[in-house]
């Protein structure tokens, strides 16, 4: 499927006219076949259509690889669009419905979004918890639907070993928690003390509370 980006009818007509000569705009091809993505695969929970990405799944290394690739490729295409048609491209719209997962996978997507030249708007569809909130809060504009919720909490870890191994693990967790708190401090309206207290709990916040805490900018109301 050929993908088009436009901001007005005039630009749309120009793209359609030129695409007849050069074979169309190069599509993004991630993976899959005629029967769609295999169940449980990364593309089973990541869907790309034009400048919209639907991410409904775990924040894992496998899923982050596909998600990051999609964001980078759309960003590249939209920057080509900007130069070629001298028109501001639409933002990348990233819809998130995820209970979280790996903090390292989340950090990788955070860096991809922060390095995008095209604005990335994040939308909470249903829920965003744990590592998924790190991804959502770094968007240039952050939206949440009326009946959606968010949850932020401390890191979890399980291990066995010698006493020194546990000391090393605590140092590792302290390092990661410092980075997590830094992201929330920079991207929300919460104070350091407030962040520390909230992270101690496993408590869901509704859309109104998310706006109050600065986790999102705006509620998308129904109707």
Q: What is each PLM-predicted segment?
A:
Residues 1-131, 138-223:
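N-terminal organellar transit peptides
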